[in-house]
């Protein structure tokens, strides 16, 4: 089954073959898998699809190719606004994700010097232990297994340490200091 995506020892996130090909920046393999019927709309445990993996990897050629094949409404701003309404995002957070800067710098920090956020259109829905959340962060300096998440339940930013399965609140968006 080309779209097999059950968690196992090799791929615990329940990703598909085409998602893994995108993760490894293998455009010829992505094309071949799609020609064989791979479904690029299947998200893994953390909400990643081949397109979002290409965005994370800054692989514009692959992202453009996959975007053209995804449902058009997934890349329509009005549809994204409608889709994210249940998450009760603060207007300031929405504006920030639309206008940036998406790279947050922490020069005074020793271990984490930066974090890069998704643009508004690329924010990902995900579920963690039956909680509906939004994944806001593409990547973070030195920590590949952390996610920055938005919880609509308490309207706070949370972080998830995937490796240790630790899920902790950080702050309300208004309490985050950032320069615009």
What residue ranges belong to the model's regions?
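Conserved ankyrin/ankyrin-like repeat signature
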Residues: 28-29, 61-62
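Conserved small/polar residues in nucleotide/adenosyl-binding loops
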Residues: 179-180
């Amino acid at each position: 089954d080309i779209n097999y995506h059950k968690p196992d020892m090799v791929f615990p996130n329940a990703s598909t073959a085409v998602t893994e090909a995108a993760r490894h920046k293998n455009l010829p393999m992505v094309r071949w898998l799609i020609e064989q019927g791979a479904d690029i709309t299947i998200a893994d445990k953390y909400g990643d699809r081949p397109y979002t993996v290409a965005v994370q990897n800054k692989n514009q050629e692959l992202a453009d190719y996959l975007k053209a094949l995804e449902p058009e409404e997934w890349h329509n701003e009005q549809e994204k606004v409608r889709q994210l309404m249940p998450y009760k995002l603060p207007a300031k957070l929405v504006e920030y994700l639309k206008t940036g800067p998406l790279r947050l710098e922490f020069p005074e920090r020793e271990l984490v010097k930066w974090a890069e956020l998704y643009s508004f259109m690329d924010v990902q829905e995900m579920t963690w232990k039956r909680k509906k959340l939004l994944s806001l962060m593409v990547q973070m300096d030195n920590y590949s297994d952390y996610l920055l998440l938005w919880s609509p339940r308490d309207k706070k930013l949370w972080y998830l340490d995937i490796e240790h399965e630790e899920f902790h609140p950080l702050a309300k968006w208004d309490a985050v200091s950032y320069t615009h």
